[in-house]
Amino acid sequence: MKQPNYYAIISAEVRYDKNLTPHAKLLYAEITALLNMNGECFATNRYFSNLYSKSVVTISKWISELSANGY
């Protein structure tokens, strides 16, 4: 898979959230970089799985972690 060539920004709120793992923080940045004008991201867990060479289950856990912490 060709790696994307765009910037991802992680807000201070997310960067310093002690409840989030570093992987979840990185995924948050990736998701926000892919948001459209309506604040929607249509990338699938499989997309992120391929991008980071992690299982879909792992990606789902990271997303659940973000969701459980209000992101």
Language model features: what each stretch is:
Residues 1-71:
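Short recognition helix of helix-turn-helix/winged-helix DNA-binding domains
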